[in-house]
Amino acid sequence: MAETVNLPRDSTLRELVAVQKASIIASGNAAAIDRLYGSLVRAAKSVEEVNILFVDWWNICWKEGVTTRNELCGRWFGTVLDDNRVHGTKEPLFATSQSAIGEATDDSVGLVCTPSTEAAANRDDFAKLPQFWALEVAAEKNADGTHTIYAVEFIDSYDDVRRSKHLCWVLQKNTYTKEWDEGGYRYFKMRCHPSTGYETWPQGTDKNGTVYGYIANPKYAAGFDSDGLIGCGSGRPPINYSSHSDNVGLWRKRGAQYAGASGRLLKWQLAMIRLKYARKGNSGTIEGCTGYSYQYAVSVGESGVKRGSTGRQPVRWVERHYRR
């Protein structure tokens, strides 16, 4: 006699999951809530879904007058965002090949990233993953080496995050990375958990040696705040014609704990390009203005001759004359 197997309907399974979720949330157990939302993030199909989960989790965990933005950001990046994936890339050393094109390795194989433009929001398979998901905040470094987060993307207004008197940072999980040469190639790998030879990002540790669950990098190039101090935020007038030493002096006026961006920022930027695009650099992938110099060769034999530019060539460039 054949055995009859009754399979639960999808609606029944969803109801059971909802009941379990409600039970965990009602318990108020922070560790259990973080594990629950960690599993939901790993199952998310898009970065928009992760954004919604973040807001949901934040509203559950936030207790006015008790919790702080620093605390919840530390929990989200340090505990909720977690996976066992290893993201990697390898590029040929110059002696192996002069090509800037590499290849994805490990769990990065098959993932696609195409830069978005003003006209189109293109594909980024990495954006929703725990090691790459990013969050804008408004924050300040404190004189004692700590920092304070004043506003958080998706929770506070974008004006408070990007245009306030504070600095606009972008947070990302403080992962473990390893880089080495082998067999004519340069390898770079990143993961959530410690492993032999892997190190966390320097910008995830403050001067007191405290390691955070997130790293912080500036979202914008430096500009002047309304009070005349140097800052980092949307809508600031840019700082031009300023030397490195002058820039350090401008940051010192904001506070002795500031000195401006370091080489760590460039290292992180290049690492993200390598991991997402499997290329040695941004050329041909993410570019702004690529041509500033317009030169026109002419043959001249005169000296002391004055020349004028015609209407066909608007003077948007510095005209220089070279004698060949």
Name what the model sees in each region.
Residues 1-48:
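Short, low-complexity N-terminal tether/leader segments at secretion or assembly junctions of large
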Residues 8, 13, 20, 34, ...:
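Short, intrinsically disordered low-complexity segments
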Residues 56-68:
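Acidic, serine/threonine- and proline/glycine-rich low-complexity repeats
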Residues 65-67, 73-176, 180-234, 314-315:
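Short acidic-hydrophobic catalytic motif
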Residues 159, 163-166, 198-321:
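Short aromatic-cysteine micro-motif
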Residues 324:
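Active-site-proximal beta-strands of protease catalytic cores
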